Amino acid sequence: MEFRVHLQADNEQKIFQNQMKPEPEASYLINQRRSANYKPNIWKNDFLDQSLISKYDGDEYRKLSEKLIEEVKIYISAETMDLVAKLELIDSVRKLGLANLFEKEIKEALDSIAAIESDNLGTRDDLYGTALHFKILRQHGYKVSQDIFGRFMDEKGTLENHHFAHLKGMLELFEASNLGFEGEDILDEAKASLTLALRDSGHICYPDSNLSRDVVHSLELPSHRRVQWFDVKWQINAYEKDICRVNATLLELAKLNFNVVQAQLQKNLREASRWWANLGIADNLKFARDRLVECFACAVGVAFEPEHSSFRICLTKVINLVLIIDDVYDIYGSEEELKHFTNAVDRWDSRETEQLPECMKMCFQVLYNTTCEIAREIEEENGWNQVLPQLTKVWADFCKALLVEAEWYNKSHIPTLEEYLRNGCISSSVSVLLVHSFFSITHEGTKEMADFLHKNEDLLYNISLIVRLNNDLGTSAAEQERGDSPSSIVCYMREVNASEETARKNIKGMIDNAWKKVNGKCFTTNQVPFLSSFMNNATNMARVAHSLYKDGDGFGDQEKGPRTHILSLLFQPLVN
């Protein structure tokens, strides 16, 4: 179907303005409407207007950054540096949020390292060096076997006891073990034993307080599951304190780059904020979450690089719509209304909304207009054809999954865990986000590109599973209190007659298994140029879920933790 067929006339494209008021509803229906009691938005427009201004958005700082980049390139390309020092430098560059600036130099260095036989690396009997070597190569898509750790294991396949005395090597192997694939038993065993050993190490007095700090940070969440940009400030502060290996030029560049990128993000947030304010939807859907800034922070977590500005704004819009529609289904709509709304999205036809309350009509109209606009921009910028049907399909699937959950709620039905996850992975909205991501950052070219999403449904499923299960771990308590439809935790507890503690442990195990499958897919394809950005975005969506729901509901309660984190990420520059 031609894209233009889907576009309404200009007068039909106009978004409802702020002054639009919902038509009165019957009092009996108003009384049936639920409320999640979400708190008002804390990020006021006046605050955003005053705060989103940075002195680092200027040529002076960009020129200084370019000068420092050239100096660091020399360090990375130095042929006289020993292997472990080179690997540590590459590791630091990544942790400091600078890897995108040195892709060519890092690849050349790792190509040389990967060509060396493992027995000739000089790290044969060095657990730390071996683990660092394994981690860096696997992160960058090189083939490296878990068998290189065999020499550190006893006849039972567990880490030899004397290695537990070396905290630095233990920590690096723990981090490396989180990059494991399915069936890599050595890494599984190492992760299990090291998790316990590193926790116990907190009771021992180590002279290196920096190392003890790193242990606590990794046990809280391994670096592979952290959103890189969310962690950059912490890593810069940690690197600055590591006087044994700090590189002054690299540190200066890391601080400057953070501030320059933050200035770009602030410009993006201003643009997204204007879009959101002009819609006026927050004023008319009082029951729904007004979380523009949090949505933007999630988009930053998926792709922070300056060249992805338009994609970040696109993704912010999509995440906002996901939240609003989720609240329509969870809180506001009756079952009959939700069926009409689902039909409207499925048929992409506003006539299906004629019997709906004005606020639900408005919600559909915003979805319609925004999706058509995004499809047009993708077609113009990336050369794709027929994007709109792809986008409307994932929105329809999302709404159908939400409708199933609404029906479960109305019938007080608790599904089996398998039934719940089959639907819940769709209602997680990951497919919506990933399909928008795919078309936004890739370009039409080969048949392989066009078939990629279909051939990699397992990747989409496992990313969705990680997001869904993290969501349930963080929001289950609040949802049970509100009486929402059941989560995976409730389904598991009922299915096997387990305690909540046991259910949560099982859910975390499912997340671990899903990560192994994601690793197996991503680390074997991320050297393919046209896929590496998309693969990185896909795994970042899973990482955002870990961050968002680590301490509860990152969307529901802005004050509980997200506020401080967002202030640091988007508003507070680093002091040089």
Swiss-Prot record:
K(+) binds at D484, S487. A motif (DDXXD motif) lies at residues 326-330. GO terms for biological process: diterpenoid biosynthetic process. Changing S487A: Loss of sesquiterpene synthase activity. Changing I281F: In strain: cv. Idared, cv. Pinkie, cv. Ralls and cv. Royal Gala. It is found in: Cytoplasm. Changing F530S: In strain: cv. Aotea. Induction: Up-regulated by ethylene. Inhibited by 1-methylcyclopropene (1-MCP). The keyword Transferase applies. Keywords: Cytoplasm, Lyase, Magnesium, Manganese, Metal-binding, Potassium, Transferase. Changing D326A: Loss of monoterpene synthase, sesquiterpene synthase and prenyltransferase activities. Loss of monoterpene synthase, sesquiterpene synthase and prenyltransferase activities. Mg(2+) 1 binds at D326, D330. Changing G129A: In strain: cv. Aotea. Changing D451G: In strain: cv. Ralls. Optimum pH is 7.0-8.5. It holds the Pfam family Terpene_synth_C. The keyword Oxidoreductase does not apply. (2E,6E)-farnesyl diphosphate binds at R289, D326, D330, R468, N471. Changing S488A: Decreased mono- and sesquiterpene synthase activity, but no effect on activity enhancement by potassium. Changing H565Q: In strain: cv. Aotea. Monomer. This is (E,E)-alpha-farnesene synthase. It comes from Malus domestica (Apple).
